[in-house]
């Protein structure tokens, strides 16, 4: 049974340290990091047990690295300055892109109800969410980096916190501090002035034991907990993304965690297993797992450069019988934000083209992608993610690639090779590579008229002119008989999402012709591990809608085309359904097919599990 949303409150998650990065870290560390001009109050028993939930106000300037992430001047989440351009926050604060892309970051903030001297507000240029974060398990790797569109000017009220040094860690029992503008009690009011609370770190064994008592137990090796079994002090809603900070031996404040989550606010977890209303410690994600990731991005963010070739010349031409393209020029570089790069590939006339991607690292298809066009500027598909697709056979002598990136993410781009092939099209080519064709033709199963092999997987995409529909006519059909056509079968879709299946065939009876409902038809053939037969052969023809007396509305939407995707491998763009903000330089290119970068391993299919 999942934890109900009103009980699971995302508020706390820790970052600790991995050894072996002293030179790297010292090269980027600000010598004035972790320095506050406000002396901390002496700790006693009562100040130790103060809390944000009903806790104490912070004197202005006490934690100059604390920032407020705001949407239309309303506080949404906290964050922590680690350099003049970089802020750390919680990944779950950035999970909703519609909100994330509208946020501004205010440093030097103290009282939310008024503008104060020393405040600085910057827009966000780049959002980088940890790759292992998932909204389905938001307590894992709940961390994100924000690159500012500008730089903070350091002074009395704006300074960076320190990142931990190699070998530096804070043992169980160490008292650390978290601050924020979160609720003063569970379900209570929001403060206007920054609050703080001191929290002891728990042992790993106690942390794991408490989490296993929950009705929906939580496990993982990334956790570190804070708090007291009797509760009473905690972070709460609105504190997400803020800092858990500890003073090191030199007195400098060091970032030990990022406010992420907890069960309730300040609840007791003593005798938790027998309680109806359970509680949890404040949970932190182990920084030893994410510090190298942080360092990689804040370093490369200062020096990364994409290739200048062709990006400044949108109609850049690459011609010849074969060649390659690396973008950026080195795998160790990252592509820049706000890019619009266009390449036109030309192989000799009357030749076709085979593309192979040897490297692919492009963020979400909503914001960063490589789009492919062919024949009269017609879109073939778009690529993103990290899983490499099979080779792609294009029935054309020219192709245009357009790469677009926005200001939210970056990655290492792509490498591809191209080669001209004589247009000796084989009807079973869809079993050797993803085959995209723009002309009528014949298709057949692998080895036809001999028996097809076990675990075969074949895919053809036909794209007719917009004024045409596509007709599939079988010449023969001999596929292993099974009652529901779930073992060996041919499927026909009028969209590449495979959401609009218009036919499914098996058995030994030649069916009637199939007519698509759009100018796109995807045909796939699959076989399982048991039994084979002769297979099939079919003809593809284009039929004018006018000949069929079918009218076309100017507002008619061509179905979005894509494949079923492994989770996280690709995303789908749909101009009507997409709620994300378009990249700054993205053109309105209408309905787009999205190419699956992980699914199309032609010729062999894995068994069912």
UniProtKB/Swiss-Prot annotation:
One of its GO terms (biological process) is fertilization. Residues 311-421, 431-543 form the CUB domain. The keyword Nucleotide-binding does not apply. Only expressed in uterus tissue. Expressed in the initial segment (IS) of the caput epididymis, the region most proximal to the testis. Residues 580-609 are annotated as: Disordered. One of its GO terms (cellular component) is extracellular region. Glycans are attached at residues 104, 356, 415, 530, 549. Residues 23-51 form a propeptide. It holds the Pfam family Trypsin. It is found in: Secreted. Disruption phenotype: Knockout male mice lacking OVCH2 are sterile. InterPro entries: CUB_dom (IPR000859), Peptidase_S1_PA (IPR009003), Peptidase_S1_PA_chymotrypsin (IPR043504), Peptidase_S1A (IPR001314), Sperma_CUB_dom_sf (IPR035914), Trypsin_dom (IPR001254), TRYPSIN_HIS (IPR018114), TRYPSIN_SER (IPR033116). Its EC number is 3.4.21.-. The active site is at 92 (charge relay system), 142 (charge relay system), 240 (charge relay system). Residues 1-22 form the signal peptide. SMART domains: CUB, Tryp_SPc. One of its GO terms (molecular function) is metal ion binding. Ca(2+) binds at residue 119. Its main location: secreted. Disulfide bonds join 77-93, 176-246, 207-225, 236-265, 311-341, 365-384, 431-458, 485-506. May be required for sperm ADAM3 processing and consequential sperm fertilizing ability. In vitro, has an endopeptidase activity. PANTHER family: ACROSIN (PTHR24252:SF8), ACROSIN-RELATED (PTHR24252). This is Ovochymase-2. It comes from Mus musculus.
